[in-house]
Structure formats: structure tokens, C-alpha cells
Amino acid sequence: MDVRRRPVKPLYPSEHISSGEPLKPHNQDSSVKASDALPLPLYLTNGLFFTMFFSVMYFLLHRWREKIRNGIPLHVLNFSELVAMVSLIASVIYLLGFFGIGFVQSFVSKGNNDSWDVEDESPEQFIDRTVTPPPVRRNIPMKSVPVAEKTAQIITPFSSEDDEVVIKSVVEGRIPSYSLESKLGDCKRAAFIRKEALQRSSGKSLEGLPLDGFDYESILGQCCEMPIGYIQIPVGIAGPLLLNGKEFSVPMATTEGCLVASTNRGCKAIYVSGGATSVLFRDAMTRAPVVRFGSAKRAAELKFFVEDPMNFETLSVVFNKSSRFARLQNIQCAIAGKNLYMRFSCSTGDAMGMNMVSKGVQNVLDYLQNEYPDMDIIGISGNYCSDKKPAAVNWIEGRGKSVVCEAIIKEDVVKKVLKTEVATLVELNMLKNLTGSAMAGALGGFNAHASNIVSAVYLATGQDPAQNIESSHCITMMEAVNDGKDLHISVTMPSIEVGTVGGGTQLASQSACLNLLGVKGANREAPGSNARLLATIVAGSVLAGELSLMSAISAGQLVKSHMKYNRSCKDVTK
């Protein structure tokens, strides 16, 4: 769905909502116009002055050319030339007054219009803002309105005392709830009216859903449609996480008790052991359209064409036109009968990149359509990408950022901080995360709770929480090193999908959390480095979470800690 910011449209007077009287569009106003005072019809008057303007201009130019040839001063005028000058000035004044003022007004109004697609709306919705709306008549019985007339009924710009009228109009279906922002010009007020209308129509209370304290303008056309408030998720801090020689305080938005505390303990164990090291070894967002041919042979021919290195440069140029940050890396094809799936991989700078890669894919599809006119484009996404679902292609080939993070935990730290033994941790990891996950038929789930940490960091930093599915693909490895005294732990995460620009990253709270990590916005000196750093921080946080939870399980502390920190004593039914 294409959601864009639309212009604020004034509405017709609210008294017509109560009375049920149909209104004439503003452009059908029957008021007296200045042109009514002209002695001739308007089209004849315009024609007269047009003819006068061009005639006298031709006459004067002809006379001036003769004066120049004969050496006569131009300012010396005879009677006919004087009459021509007066006629020229009169015609210019008339034409400028008739056409020029309207042009200037339209130019100024366009310059002040904060919209992208004014032409999308009907001109019948516009009225003169200088007209003061009449007072709203209360307690007047509603008249039945024919269906054909309902579409023309809308109300004037509302003042604060008119909220009740608007709410009733929304409840009764005369004002679409989705149009409140564009009609009112106040996003917060639109959210309030929508929320109140929903409570009345559903009969359910939304008292606990807050409305104040949020910038609804910031989500218009970008993050959420038809808002009625916002939810509150506590944000905790784990750390410092010592990663690649730098310290990070990791924000985690969660409602699960123990999660932040456990991750914080893991960060402490890593810190006192000398820190963790992470490496990003792949960076490529993917999109895989599906196309169909009349035969499998033709599908195979396109596969050979796309995968031919001789054609890759041409396809790259076409693809990279979509953005100055998009750079096509490779195209991987798969055939199913006469259907072809093409998995495009590209770097996307500091953006997560789904929109960017989709635009590039569309460019290539348009190009291929000319080369293969019998190609039928079924969909720009054929699930071979694969987005927001567990898939072996992501686990094997990766999607987004692929990161490995490791640390060596000292023996005394394992005993004093984690309250367990190295050998116990290694055995538990093998039987739980490896063998147990294999028995369950897990796909990318060879870990204890990577999704817990990924979800919490994603919510705090404005990432797409639905991409937690593939981003949480992780295999946790543990091994005794240094003669069995110390613990080597690592997490390998092939598809961390993050960005530091776009989407929810521009919201105030999420932007503050990104700023805390030092990755807010785009990195102009090294495009893409902020998003890559965020991916390594996610992996480092997962490493800390895995280390602490596995230690709690091996020491038999899991149930005890959750009974202490993860139980609610509040009766939510009251």
C-alpha cells in the first residue's frame, strides 16, 4: 500500500451534518463576480484586449523601425503613435490584472502547500478558509440522507468544541476514520477522535492506552496508519559490552523479567575476561522475484543469461540506478518447472534495504522484459528471498549482515560470575543447542534464546520486529580450551537484518537508543558502517545472553530466578 502524506483539506460547515442538508461544491458558488459588471461578455472582452495588444505592438514596432532607418528620435510621437501607446498600456494592465494575479496566487499557494499529491483529492472538498463557520446546532434530529448525497457531505475545519460532532460522524460512518489526519490537519487530534470513536463503536474501554507524549506527525505516511495511541515497553540497559575493544551500553526493550539482568551478567563475564571479538563476513540484502515462461526451456535460457558473467555488468548498471548506495553483488537462480526464481543480493548502505533492493529488482525486470517479451512477471517477491520466515536459503546463503562473535571466558569467571563449570557448559551446549535442536528439526535454531535478545534490541532501536525470525538464526558453539580450564564460546548469525536510517529508526525514542550505541543515522564518511556496527553489537549481545542463560540452566538457577524476577503479582482483571 502506497501511504503518502496528503494535504490538509478543509471541510463543509458542521451544521449541515446535523441538518442533513446537501451542500454545493465551493467551485459552484453563486456569489456576484467582478466580471458581471463588464459591458460585453467575458470572452468578447478578452478577445478585444488580446487583439488590441498584438495590433498596437505590431504598429509601434513597424513605426520604430522606420524612425531608426530615417534617424528620427524614438521619443517623438505623433497622434496615432500616442493613441497606440495608450492602447498598449491599457491592454497590458487589463491582461495582467485578469491573468497575472491568478497565476501569482496559484504559484504562492503551491509553494506553501506541504503535500506530495494534491491532485489526488476532489476539488469539491476545498472551501474558503476565511469564511467563519456557523455555530454548531446541537440536539437536532438527524434527517435521512440519500446514499448519493452522503459522498458530498463533509464538514468545515473543526475547532476544539466540535470534537463531539466529528466523533459522531466517524461512528456513523460519514467521515472515514483513515481520513482524519488529512481533514483535520492535526495528527494528535485525529488520533484522539479515532480512539474515542473506536471506544464508542466497540463498547470497549481503551483507558490504559496513552495518547499524550508522542509525536504523531513523525509517523504520518511512514510508520503507522490510523493511530489511536502508543504502547509502553520498558527499556533496560545491559553492559557495558566490551566488543572489539570498545564499550557499548546495550538498550533492550522487553516485558520479560530476568532478560536484561541475565544479559547484563553475560556482559560482565565477557568484560572481565577481556572482551569479545566480532567479524562481519557478509553484507547483502536480498529480493527474489518469480517469473514464468511458456516452457521450462525458456526459463532455463533466462537462468543462463542472468548467471553469465558477461551479462552481470549490464544488469548491475541497470540495478544500481535505483540508489546511490545500492550495489548489486550477485544473482542466484532456481528453477521450478517453467518458473524461474532470481535471488538478487546487494549492499544497501546504512539502510536495512528492502525498499532499495526492490526498486533495483524492478529496474532489472523491466530491462529483461524487453529482452524476453514472453516473460510473465508473477511477483516481485517469490519467497526465495526469504523475508520474515524461517528458510534454509537464509541459513545457508545469509541475508542482511552475517556476523560471527566469539570470546574466551576465564575459568575463575565461569565459577565466580556464572556459578558453573566449563565442562558442564560444554556438555549442556552439545546436548541442548546441538543435539536437542537437531531432534526437534530446528532450522537456524541451534541456540538457547537468541531471539530474546534480538527482539529486545530491535524494539529499542527501531528495527522491523518481524525480521526477528531470520535475524535470530544462530548456532551457539562452546568448547573447552587452554587445557580445559577456559571456555571458548561463539555465536554465528548469518542473517541479521538491521539499519540505522528509515522506518522506526527516526522515532525519538528509538533514535535516542541508536545514539547511545553511536550508530544514529547514516555514516557519511563510510556509508554502511553504522548498520554493520549495529549488527555486530546485536551478535555480541546475543553472545552475552547465551552465555548467561546456559550458565543458569547448567547451575539449576533458571526456575529460581524466573520465580523471583519474572512473576506478576498484579491482578489484571480488576
Swiss-Prot record:
| Spans traversing the lipid bilayer | 41-61, 83-103
Localization terms from the record: Endoplasmic reticulum membrane
Keywords, in A-Z order: Endoplasmic reticulum, Glycoprotein, Isoprene biosynthesis, Membrane, NADP, Oxidoreductase, Transmembrane, Transmembrane helix
Drop me one GO molecular function for this one: hydroxymethylglutaryl-CoA reductase (NADPH) activity
Question: What pathway does the UniProt record associate with this protein?
Answer: Metabolic intermediate biosynthesis; (R)-mevalonate biosynthesis; (R)-mevalonate from acetyl-CoA: step 3/3
Q: Which GO terms describe its cellular component?
A: endoplasmic reticulum membrane; peroxisomal membrane
Pfam families hit by this protein: HMG-CoA_red (PF00368)
Tissue expression as described in the entry:
Expressed in mature petals and anthers.
The segment annotated Catalytic runs over 162-574
Tell me what reaction this enzyme catalyses. Answer: (R)-mevalonate + 2 NADP(+) + CoA = (3S)-3-hydroxy-3-methylglutaryl-CoA + 2 NADPH + 2 H(+)
Question: At which residues is glycosylation annotated?
Answer: N78, N113, N320, N433, N566
Location of the active site: E256 (charge relay system), K388 (charge relay system), D464 (charge relay system), H562 (proton donor)
The annotated region (Linker) lies at 104-161
Q: How does it sit in the membrane?
A: Multi-pass membrane protein
Return the annotated region ranges for Disordered: 1-30
Q: Name one GO biological process term.
A: coenzyme A metabolic process
Q: Which family does it belong to?
A: Belongs to the HMG-CoA reductase family.
Name the chain's protein: 3-hydroxy-3-methylglutaryl-coenzyme A reductase 3
Q: Which organism is it from?
A: Solanum tuberosum
